[in-house]
Amino acid sequence: MSWDDAIDGVDRDTPGGRMPRAWNVAARLRAANDDIVHAQQADGLPAYAELHCLSDFSFLRGASSAEQLFARAQQCGYSALAITDECSLAGIVRGLEASRATGVRLIVGSEFTLVDGTRFVLLVENAHGYPQLCGLITTARRAASKGAYRLDRAEVQAQFRDVAPGVFALWLPGAQPQAEQGAWLQQVFGERAFLAVELHREQDDVARLHVLQALAQQLGMTALASGDVHMAQRRERIVQDTLTAIRHTLPLAECGAHLFRNGERHLRTRRALGNIYPDALLQATVELAQRCTFDISKISYTYPRELVPEGHTPTSYLRQLTEAGIRRRWPGGITAKVREDIEKELALIALKKYEAFFLTVQDVVRFAREQNILCQGRGSSANSAVCYALGITAVNPDETRLLMARFLSEKRDEPPDIDVDFEHERREEVLQYVYSKYGRERAALAATVICYRGKSAVRDVAKAFGLPPDQIALLANCYGWGNGETPMDQRIEEAGFDLANPLINKILAVTEHLRDHPRHLSQHVGGFVISDEPLSLLVPVENAAMANRTIIQWDKDDLETMKLLKVDCLALGMLTCIRKTLDLVRGHRGRNYSIATLPGGDAPTYKMIQRADTVGVFQIESRAQMAMLPRLKPAAFYDLVIEVAIVRPGPIQGDMVHPYLRRRQGREEVNYPSPAVEDILKPTLGVPLFQEQVMELLMHAADYSEDEADNLRRSMAAWRRGGDMEQHRTRVRERMQGKGYASSFIDQIFEQIKGFGSYGFPQSHAASFAKLVYASCWLKRHEPAAFACGLLNAQPMGFYSASQIVQDARRGSPERERVEVLPVDVLHSDWDNTLVGGRPWRSAADPGEQPAIRLGMRQVAGLSQVVAQRIVAARTQRAFADIGDLCLRAALDEKARLALAEAGALQGMVGNRNAARWAMAGVEARCPLLPGSPEERPVEFEAPRAGEEILADYRSVGLSLRQHPMALLRPQMRQRRILGLRELQGRRHGSGVHVAGLVTQRQRPATAKGTIFVTLEDEQGMINVIVWSHLALRRRRALLESRLLAVRGRWERVDGVEHLIAGDLYDLSNLLGDMQLPSRDFH
């Protein structure tokens, strides 16, 4: 059924047409350009420019994207289109891109409603007006909380006082026009103030037209036509109505006057406009549009220059810092190749005038290092020899094959991308340094556009259509889980919905339309934009949700289009873990290391990695990575670079993984069609695993220039989003055939290139991450107690819960020592987990003894750091005499007392949990007494049973140092003939087994075609279970909801990789009672 069928009931030409009789729309909306009624282009139709139009960046108001609006404007023959989102320029860059694509001229503007109700639109006339508009939006947004704005007349007048306005103002009179509002606008903007006549085929249109024309004449203002456009086409009215209901948090049936009376707020044909407005009002729109000559693509931008000391230019100062870095990084001197790379890069940086950008990033990194905040550059910037010399990145050009064009290119007219990771717990210090260094008027975070996805859209839409909460949840679950092999209609019917029901039909249709529709702005994870001038002259700035944060209204793609430079200050939990671990090793073990000085090429570390003993380490801790490690068997640093990169969608979909492994294992011969190809692909055995290899391959085998190769690399990402790669296939084929390469090799290489469209790593990025992989693995192998302790203190982060980290540390392995873990105790614990006992490291021959970990009070649920610090401070002064003394001197409230009792943290003072609960219950009566006063004879309490203790441990601390829950259930498991996981070691490949365990992880990789990977844990270890899509659908509830899952299946053991192929699943969670266990699902 077409979208047009949905509006058959609308009285299109009758004034006051209210609602369609039936919204019987298809389950999917067509693309925006389908079935558009093309405007007649015959002579005699009036020219028109739409000057008041909201895009979907007027959140929950505008129903159409800029692309849809400009396509419609082009088809209707408009001379120009103004995007006037409410107090926002968030969608204007998309408007610029759509304008370029269609040839319809863009006018920059914004709509405002003052606190007194006055409504108007400002349109930018020239380069003077644009910063005025940005400044006004910034003023309004900074005066309110995130997502809102506040503006009054005084602030408008202040913005334009003593300056010639570079904007035009369109007054938007209300239903009962108040001449005073128009007179005020005229007072502020003079002859630049216009009266917008907006007619929408309502009963009073004729009378309203006469009233507004008379009012314009009375005020001496020019009247012009305007559409108050909220959608590209009438057919999108159902979407606009739904957005209105969502915005007002009301069901559609109760929205009443909040909804527009009809669907006329769309881009109407010029014939329709000619039938509504007098010619003079239409002509006035064109004349005003012609006066708006501002081109937003021409805005100028200068990076901060105050970092350049007197007597230097940006070029000379960058050179000085680079040369100093060269002496520090290469004390014995650099190779001729590295010198050549640095000189070439410095020349290109100067040509592109990026010196100030590099100086700014270097300054941020310098600050972090001075504050002992670990940081490291990543991404394509690790291809930069200059970044390495400046200390921004950690990848030595001598160690890896760098390709500068991946990072910086003469022909690529976009800024370089420098990403720097900082400790996640201390990154805020870095962000606040940037704010303090440059001021909030010159530094702000980039925005991220939060868009509807299927699940969030259907929730909001179904609620707007009045579905009850239980049905909304059922419908949302259809979007939240499933695989592409199962049609959505089938999932919805299986959930109990009737697709013949018109209401369900409508909900699904609008949901599909709202997929990827902008919902609101959020802040980028760390992308800073810094300017030499106030940012609000370039782009509006508004408040973020977090205190002391401000964001601009453009996202990273907008910044790229507008050629504004962004510094990415990102947060990485593993850096926090490593820094805390190194501090513990230094303080407790006497070994003073940094990431750079850890012993390299350590055989025991690589042996541990090859056994996939990598719980908690960086990057190679996932089950997919663990399954790869015994097959790839990393034995050197470059092997880790490959390991990081190979378990990615790009190499998997490009069929690169298995050929590489076969060649590495000697099962497949490696042949190179030419010496040039061998030089490029030999490190990866003839398989292009990295983006840089693809680019080099094209440059040598297809005579691509650096910039042409980079363009193809960029096309990979565009192809993933629906672009066209075939033009490149033809070009690559012709060029490679011309150089004598066989068609089979060309086709193989091109399919592998296409695989990178599904996300592949640049080698530089993989090498940066591999540095942290090795560091974390070395620490886990040689300092297991410190590493586990640092990992616990850096939570939340990574794949594993505190319980799994502790279980892994206590279990140990053939490659690393077991670690003793001691419980939380108010007599000994600090806030953080700490190391106790052991013997310091003396030498390789005398490594000392591993200390134990004392769990800290940070593990106690419901206990704040402030309370824990009071306990430690009081204990440091003198020992606690009794429970009353503890509560009195540490000022423990009821919540804190209960948390400590439940956590077993009072064991050293009063005994078991039951005794602790009783003791804390009587504290109120005893607190007024002096510490040490005579007390009643203590009551003897029977200790809780083992199961109760374990249950309480998980509830209050999130882990247990007692028996594993599965150990308690082992007798019942034996009765069911369920094996312990250690018993699987003796089973032959392909044998049938029956196991059960606690579910600790569920994963569904995008490349797995619906296959689910589940990790089970018992008292003996962990295993990976593979659940094929057909079983996942059949046993969906057990798979997704079980805490304790039993599996019958086939045990597989190939190339050192062990896993269980599930044949059937069932839920045994009832055996756990109320015990709640953490599981990391689908991350």
Curated annotation (Swiss-Prot):
Q: Under which EC number(s) is this enzyme classified?
A: 2.7.7.7
Under the heading CDD domains, the entry gives: DnaE_OBF, PHP_PolIIIA_DnaE2
Q: Which residues form the signal peptide?
A: none
Its localization reads:
Cytoplasm
Its top-level enzyme class, in one word, is transferase
Entry's Gene Ontology cellular component terms? cytoplasm
Indicate whether Transmembrane appears among the record's keywords: no
Return the protein name.
Error-prone DNA polymerase
The species this protein was found in: Xanthomonas axonopodis pv. citri (strain 306)
Lineage from the top down? Answer: Bacteria, Pseudomonadati, Pseudomonadota, Gammaproteobacteria, Lysobacterales
Which gene carries the instructions for this protein? Answer: dnaE2
